[in-house]
Structure formats: structure tokens, C-alpha cells
Amino acid sequence: NVRKGPSADQAIVWVFSRAGLPVEVIAESDNWRRVRDSEGADGWVFHSLLSGRRTVLVSPWTKTPENVPLYSRKSKSASTVAELAPSVLGSVLSCDGEWCELSIDDYSGFVQQDKLWGVYRGEVLK
């Protein structure tokens, strides 16, 4: 449940319908976190409802069905493991500031970091 303010007394403004979606924490108030989603909507969530596991969405801003390649190595010349549709959800294994290693269903590989929502440009995750 995402609320209007940092309290259980505040109105619920929306409910996430899909588990594991990435959010950006933009503020804190006691045990509440103000989060923003990939569409720019924000609200307050109780801290225990959030996970420390990093996930990303593949180019959710794309209006056309332009797939993003999942490469076998950190190189555009590497073989393509899969073609990822916009808004596919993936688990982050690591990021080096330019590439992220992802796990998506039965696939794993590398995606250019600027094609992902849920990690910052240049962010390094080990």
C-alpha cells in the first residue's frame, strides 16, 4: 500500500500489483519511506514492505516496442542471450557503472546500464 503521507492513518493512493518492482527512496520519516516509481508517481510506504534486493525495469520509458539485448558479456559485440521487451523486470547481480549483470527468469547476462530504470547512471553495485 502506498499512502498519501507517512502514517497508517493516511489514505492509500495506490497499491502495487506486481511484487519486486524497483522504487527510488526519496525521503524518510521514522519508519516510513517516500518512494517514486518508474512512472514518476510517489507516495509513502512502511519500511518493512520494502526489500533491499535490487531490481530494474528494462527501458520502461520506451513508447515503441524496441527490445534491448541481453548480452553474454559486457560488450555490444558479444552474442545476444535474449531480447528484452520494455518493462521486463530483472534482478541485479552487479553493475560497474556502464553495464549491469542481470538475472531474468532462466536467463542471465549483461545490459547497458543506461537502458535500465532502478539503478543510477554510473552506480557501481557489487
Regions found by a protein language model. Give the residues of each.
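Boundary regions of SH3-family modules and the immediately adjacent low-complexity/disordered segments
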Residues: 1, 7-8, 15, 22-24, ...
